Amino acid sequence: MNPDLNMNPHDSGRTDPYAPELGEIATDEGDGENVTKTGTTTVGLATEEGVVIATDRRASLGGRFVSNKNVVKVEEIHPTAAMTLVGSVGGAQSFIRTLRSEASLYETRRDEPMSINALATLAGNFARGGPFLAIHPILGGVDDEGSHVYTIDPAGGVMEDDYAVTGSGMQVAYGTIEGEYESDLSTEEAKELATNAVQAASERDTGSGNGLVIAEITDEGVEIEEFDDLADAL
């Protein structure tokens, strides 16, 4: 039996086919050097009015070299939902394209958009069974049941919360949010808190920085803005 047939794709000795990265990715030990590739900070906050998602704009190679300073790490995938790009660029982009296509096909066939819970479940199924390497996105959306923020982990786990953070800057960003979050935040207050969280992470995390992308999601649609200076978003 060929031993390679049973090799876990995240085991050592395998070369990462996706680069650069926008987030945590598997360690490649094939050359004897353990290099954990990290980067990015993405934040999602649910409010009564909708969902706010904020991310930085930096892409890195191995978490040590800045390969791009203008990456838009949040994309619309549904008329009232958006998802962040976290992980390898190739894997994250492929994941979003696949999910967007399925959501569009569902709407075409049924003449109504998919619920955000169903979209999150579908995303988890794809992450679990698909070839999407080391992704960990945030899904935010609004439907008839209200505002939703989900995280999708690399193994396909789906978790909903009032707010979520993923990426290498998550510890700093979570600390900022935990100290200021309130359940009755307005959209503008949520934008300010999300911006502060990304800014704090960018100060300490080498994989995060180079501006800000803010997505505001309501029952009317998705609006995405970019800022070179985080102060301009406040």
Swiss-Prot record:
Major localization listed first in the record, in broad terms: cytoplasm
Prosegment residue ranges: 1-39
Active-site residues, Swiss-Prot/TrEMBL: T40 (nucleophile)
Keyword Secreted: no
Gene Ontology molecular function: any one: threonine-type endopeptidase activity
Subcellular location: Cytoplasm
Pfam families in the cross-refs: Proteasome
EC number in record: 3.4.25.1
Catalysis performed (reactions): Cleavage of peptide bonds with very broad specificity
InterPro entries for the chain: Ntn_hydrolases_N, Pept_T1A_Psome_bsu_arc, Pept_T1A_subB, Proteasome_sua/b, Proteasome_suB-type
Keywords for the protein's UniProt record, in alphabetical order: Autocatalytic cleavage, Cytoplasm, Hydrolase, Protease, Proteasome, Threonine protease, Zymogen
UniProt entry tagged with the keyword Zinc: no
Single Gene Ontology BP annotation: proteasomal protein catabolic process
Activity regulation description: The formation of the proteasomal ATPase PAN-20S proteasome complex, via the docking of the C-termini of PAN into the intersubunit pockets in the alpha-rings, triggers opening of the gate for substrate entry. Interconversion between the open-gate and close-gate conformations leads to a dynamic regulation of the 20S proteasome proteolysis activity.
Region annotated Disordered, chain positions: 1-35
GO cellular component: cytoplasm; proteasome core complex, beta-subunit complex
Family from the record: Belongs to the peptidase T1B family.
Assembly and interaction partners: The 20S proteasome core is composed of 14 alpha and 14 beta subunits that assemble into four stacked heptameric rings, resulting in a barrel-shaped structure. The two inner rings, each composed of seven catalytic beta subunits, are sandwiched by two outer rings, each composed of seven alpha subunits. The catalytic chamber with the active sites is on the inside of the barrel. Has a gated structure, the ends of the cylinder being occluded by the N-termini of the alpha-subunits. Is capped at one or both ends by the proteasome regulatory ATPase, PAN.
Function according to Swiss-Prot or TrEMBL: Component of the proteasome core, a large protease complex with broad specificity involved in protein degradation.
Official protein name in the record: Proteasome subunit beta
